[in-house]
């Protein structure tokens, strides 16, 4: 399944903590799309994926104010 989590209103480290909490509730092969603002530390999600044994499927700019990170459990 695919899930989405809008974290644009949050500042670091809350997006990382929220993503970690959400991933705990997902099944293997589920995907989690994270919507972040540019103030979020989006580069940290590469490290986060490695440390939490999840795949970083994709990262891209959705607009000037939103960055998308897709993780797969």
UniProtKB/Swiss-Prot annotation:
InterPro entries: TusA-like, TusA-like_sf. SUPFAM superfamilies: SirA-like (SSF64307). The active site is at residue 12. Gene3D superfamilies: TusA-like domain. It holds the Pfam family TusA. PROSITE patterns: UPF0033 (PS01148). Signal peptide: none annotated. Belongs to the sulfur carrier protein TusA family. This is Putative sulfur carrier protein HI_0242. It comes from Haemophilus influenzae (strain ATCC 51907 / DSM 11121 / KW20 / Rd).
């Amino acid at each position: 399944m695919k899930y989405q989590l809008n974290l644009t209103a949050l500042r670091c480290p809350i997006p990382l903590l929220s993503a970690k909490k959400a991933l705990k509730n997902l099944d293997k092969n589920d995907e989690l799309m994270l919507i972040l603002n540019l103030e979020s530390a989006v580069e940290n999600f590469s490290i986060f994926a490695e440390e939490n044994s999840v795949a970083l499927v994709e990262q891209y700019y959705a607009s000037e104010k939103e960055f998308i990170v897709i993780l797969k459990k």
